């Protein structure tokens, strides 16, 4: 059976979602209102008419956070074994994964909100936090060892305090573009086990692993400035 349902209308105010100790427990903080706590609720939905901002906080353990686009400004978010909470008419989403080696999975679909920030925070091990994004076309722009941005289809995601990024092209035969920063930069490309997978490392900045581009998918390296001063190193398997 579908169980109990809780629906909240934020009235456009900022919303913070906090996971509880059990999968069906947690709370919502709506700016200007009292905290709404829930327990043993199986279906949850929050609407923020056209101007809502949402912050989702993980735990200090190793979390699995999943975001699935269900519309241009609609999406679901689940944390670990929690229900996938439906958020409708939100224009801003911030994921604060907190401490631990967290996995943040984003299936963009038609999502195109104005602001989407992923903050991995402090890792537990050297492997650290992993952001995986699925779509057809992407443009990845690293800016620091743990930061950058990735545009997947119509959605830009700002990345901070994150150690690994993976792009899944869903065999859509799209184009993956990696934009290198201005100035002379060395980029390494290591092919993967399949023709549509591999690893790209721009200098010592945040690296990118990609897969499932499709048999006719392509990879483009694009220098941010007009001066032809970059170097590409192709690392073969032989």
Regions found by a protein language model. Give the residues of each.
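Acidic, glycine-rich low-complexity segments
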Residues: 1-238
């Amino acid at each position: 059976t579908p169980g109990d349902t809780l629906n909240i209308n934020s009235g456009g105010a900022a919303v913070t979602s906090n996971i509880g100790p059990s999968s069906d427990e947690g709370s919502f903080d709506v700016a200007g209102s009292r905290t709404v706590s829930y327990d043993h609720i199986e279906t949850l939905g929050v609407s923020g008419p056209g101007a809502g901002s949402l912050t989702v906080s993980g735990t200090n353990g190793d979390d699995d956070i999943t975001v699935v686009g269900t519309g241009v400004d609609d999406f679901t978010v689940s944390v670990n074994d929690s229900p996938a909470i439906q958020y409708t008419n939100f224009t801003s989403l911030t994921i604060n994964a907190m401490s631990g080696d967290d996995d943040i999975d984003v299936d963009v679909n038609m999502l195109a909100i104005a602001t989407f920030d992923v903050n991995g925070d402090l890792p537990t091990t050297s492997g650290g936090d992993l952001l995986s994004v699925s779509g057809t076309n992407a443009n990845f722009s690293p800016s620091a060892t743990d930061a950058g941005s990735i545009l997947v289809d119509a959605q830009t995601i700002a990345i901070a305090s994150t150690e690994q990024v993976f792009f899944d092209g869903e065999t859509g035969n799209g184009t993956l573009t990696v934009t290198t920063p201005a100035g002379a930069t060395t980029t390494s490309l290591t092919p993967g086990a399949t023709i549509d997978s591999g690893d790209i490392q721009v200098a010592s900045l945040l690296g990118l692993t990609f897969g499932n581009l499709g048999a006719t998918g392509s990879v483009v390296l694009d220098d941010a400035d007009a001066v032809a001063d970059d170097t590409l190193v192709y690392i073969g398997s032989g």
